[in-house]
Amino acid sequence: MNIFVKLREAIKESCVEAMNQIDASRIAIYLFHNGVRSTHGINFFKVSCICEKVAIGSGIRERMIEHNSIPINLFDEMVSKLMADNRYIIMNNEETQNTNSKIFISADKIHYTQLIALYDINNNILGFIAVEMSKPYSKDGADKEQEILNELAKQLIPVLSYSDYTAIQTQ
């Protein structure tokens, strides 16, 4: 249990720093995992929020408890594009309100949510970083945010790869 607390603290510390750099309203780490199997042994893959930070005064609430074991088949297009492009942007508009990806928009004041893929050292997708932004979308701004979030992803890989993290801690 102690290692779990240390892992979460290491993740949260890195997330807060990135959140402050890009002025995000919320930052969260989501990991893909295996869910329950069907009677024929087919795995049901899911995604869960393992860590989040909400900016003080943002007017949005934490979502970690409700963003637990969500079936990824609800987000086939989103996950496919995230894997292909390493990035996916969800705009808060009428079109999004008719899709399952709206769960990544916490409040009306959020203009967009940017997802950045997380990969392990073997280039297998682990999950994604989600940042919710209250400021209006601009391509240049989102590209700058992506650069910072890509750096965060690099920092998180050894922490999320538990065996690598324990090796680093013992050095």
Which residues fall in each region the model found?
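Well-ordered, non-membrane alpha-helical segments in soluble/globular domains
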Residues: L7-S14, N73-D76, E145-A153
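Short, glycine/acidic-rich beta->alpha junctions
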Residues: A10, D108-I110
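Short acidic, S/G/P-rich loop/turn micro-motifs used as interaction or catalytic elements
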Residues: V36, E95-Q97, S134-K139
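Regulatory sensory and allosteric helical modules in signal-transduction proteins
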Residues: S48-D108
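Short hydrophobic/aromatic beta-strand element in the GNAT-like acyltransferase core
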Residues: K102, L115, F128
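A short, aliphatic-rich beta-strand micro-motif
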Residues: H111-D120
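Juxtadomain coupling helices with adjacent low-complexity linkers
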Residues: I125-Q171
